[in-house]
């Protein structure tokens, strides 16, 4: 077992009850453009078109041939675009149950599939986009071959669901998905899980155990310790629920768009796990469930999720949780001189440090304005990777991409720097800064 000792488990209230319930009926779903880094769509539909589940919505001009499909049948009600016509979302009003059909195989035939059969079927159904590369966290080229593939069957994010609870609802789907994915690489297929977790076993996969504090469950952490990446050595990652969807696709011939999502946070009345659709409207999913006041809906983790509002108020493609926090617009007078029994800090500056096990009603407040980056050692306390955290973050801030590559930025995704953003006394958001640098590296080298 690989034990992660440097990191942080956030003591936040609103932890969801670990039992799965049916969610409310969803009337609209969406494919969010921002979920796919650098993607430039060629649209195949327009507002008013009727679509089936699994029908093509658009392809990517940059990664030629990669298809993005509808998660549900219905009518395209909106194609939302932002600045410079960047695609924000394609919204579908759900109606009917029509679905496209794809190649279908018996479970015994999955082990004999050719690689091209797997690639074609995944791409036809839109599940090729469920795979993400590292570096760059994008959908891979259709002819790319990874050094390794990672499936994370654990989640240490605050307020997350227990993946084994979800996987063991349909264990054979998970195993079938692993068999299919094993055809895409000549290297290892890693399944990473928590200590003592009951994960369905398959001979095609290598199982690794991780323990300790967050980010022990991040796929970037797993790659760093098991198969580090570089520009010449690419690895892929696939979410555990997408592995199950892949298994179902190949045995049923139909796109599976069900997703189990954790609803949690201090402002959630009834934190729990619900069964819903990929891309579900978060307003409909949380209707009647929010506490009074001004709230912020987050698709994903409180550390690395996306503010979901307006045309993007839908469940993200790679998200398994929805978090709700109160908007922290208040500015307490001289909060830095109070004992702080009701406040949390990663540094031992409040008396709450002595109150082990206490949980807090976090808000969106940053507790201060932006200022210069100060190296206090807090970054190193939450960075478990073998990386010089302060030096890397400085390189990213000034845009020194050559030094950032030497210091290991190619191994990272936004979620890997989320804890650095949380503990930063300068209030920097390192995720977007990292993405800007990765985009430059991809373009310029």
Swiss-Prot record:
| PANTHER family (UniProt xref) | NA(+)-TRANSLOCATING NADH-QUINONE REDUCTASE SUBUNIT A (PTHR37839:SF1)
Q: What is its EC number?
A: 7.2.1.1
Superkingdom field: Bacteria
Gene Ontology terms for molecular function: oxidoreductase activity, acting on NAD(P)H, quinone or similar compound as acceptor
The free-text function statement in the UniProt record for this protein reads:
NQR complex catalyzes the reduction of ubiquinone-1 to ubiquinol by two successive reactions, coupled with the transport of Na(+) ions from the cytoplasm to the periplasm. NqrA to NqrE are probably involved in the second step, the conversion of ubisemiquinone to ubiquinol.
Return one Gene Ontology term, BP aspect: sodium ion transport
Q: Could you list this entry's UniProt keywords, alphabetically sorted.
A: Ion transport, NAD, Sodium, Sodium transport, Translocase, Transport, Ubiquinone
Identify the species of origin. Answer: Teredinibacter turnerae (strain ATCC 39867 / T7901)
Q: Give the catalysed reaction(s), semicolon-separated.
A: a ubiquinone + n Na(+)(in) + NADH + H(+) = a ubiquinol + n Na(+)(out) + NAD(+)
Subunit field text: Composed of six subunits; NqrA, NqrB, NqrC, NqrD, NqrE and NqrF.
Q: Which protein, by its recorded name, is this?
A: Na(+)-translocating NADH-quinone reductase subunit A
The UniProt entry's sequence similarity note says:
Belongs to the NqrA family.
Asked if Chloroplast is a keyword of the record, the answer is: no
């Amino acid at each position: 077992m690989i034990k992660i000792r440097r990191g942080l488990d956030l003591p936040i209230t609103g932890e969801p009850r670990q039992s799965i319930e049916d969610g409310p009926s969803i009337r609209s779903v969406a494919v969010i453009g921002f979920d796919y880094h650098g993607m430039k769509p060629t649209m195949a539909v327009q507002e008013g078109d009727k679509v089936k589940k699994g029908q093509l919505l658009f392809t990517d001009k940059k990664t030629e041939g990669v298809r993005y499909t509808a998660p549900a049948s219905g009518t395209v009600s909106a194609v939302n675009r932002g600045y410079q016509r960047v695609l924000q979302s394609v919204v579908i009003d759900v109606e009917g149950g029509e679905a496209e059909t794809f190649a279908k195989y018996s479970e015994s035939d999955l082990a004999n599939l050719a690689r091209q059969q797997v690639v074609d079927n995944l791409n036809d159904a839109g599940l090729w986009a469920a795979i993400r590369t590292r570096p760059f966290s994008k959908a891979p080229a259709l002819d790319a071959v990874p050094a390794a593939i990672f499936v994370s069957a654990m989640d240490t994010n605050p307020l997350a669901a227990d993946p084994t609870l979800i996987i063991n609802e349909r264990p054979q789907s998970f195993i079938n998905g692993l068999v299919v994915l094993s055809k895409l690489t000549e290297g290892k297929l890693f399944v990473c899980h928590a200590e003592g977790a009951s994960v369905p076993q398959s001979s095609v996969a290598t199982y690794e155990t991780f323990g300790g504090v967050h980010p022990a469950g991040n796929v970037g952490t797993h790659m760093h310790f098991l198969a580090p990446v570089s520009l010449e050595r690419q690895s892929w990652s696939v979410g555990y629920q997408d592995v199950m969807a892949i298994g179902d696709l190949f045995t049923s011939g139909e796109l599976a768009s069900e997703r189990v999502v954790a609803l949690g946070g201090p402002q959630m009345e009834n934190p729990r796990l619900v069964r819903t659709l990929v891309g579900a409207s978060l307003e409909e999913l949380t209707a009647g469930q929010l506490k009074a006041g001004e709230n912020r809906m987050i698709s994903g983790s409180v550390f690395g999720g996306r503010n979901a509002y307006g045309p993007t108020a839908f469940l993200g493609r790679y998200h398994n949780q929805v978090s709700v926090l109160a908007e922290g617009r208040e500015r307490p007078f001289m909060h830095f001189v109070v004992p702080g029994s009701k406040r949390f800090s990663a540094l031992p500056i409040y008396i709450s440090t002595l109150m082990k096990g206490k949980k807090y009603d976090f808000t969106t407040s940053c507790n201060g304005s932006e200022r210069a980056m100060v190296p206090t050692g807090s970054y190193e306390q939450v960075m478990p990777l073998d990386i010089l955290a302060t030096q890397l973050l400085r390189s990213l801030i000034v845009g020194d991409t050559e030094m950032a590559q030497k210091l290991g930025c190619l191994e990272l995704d936004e979620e890997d720097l989320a804890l650095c953003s949380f503990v930063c006394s300068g209030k920097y958001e390192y995720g977007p800064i990292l993405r800007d640098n990765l985009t430059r590296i991809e373009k310029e080298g």
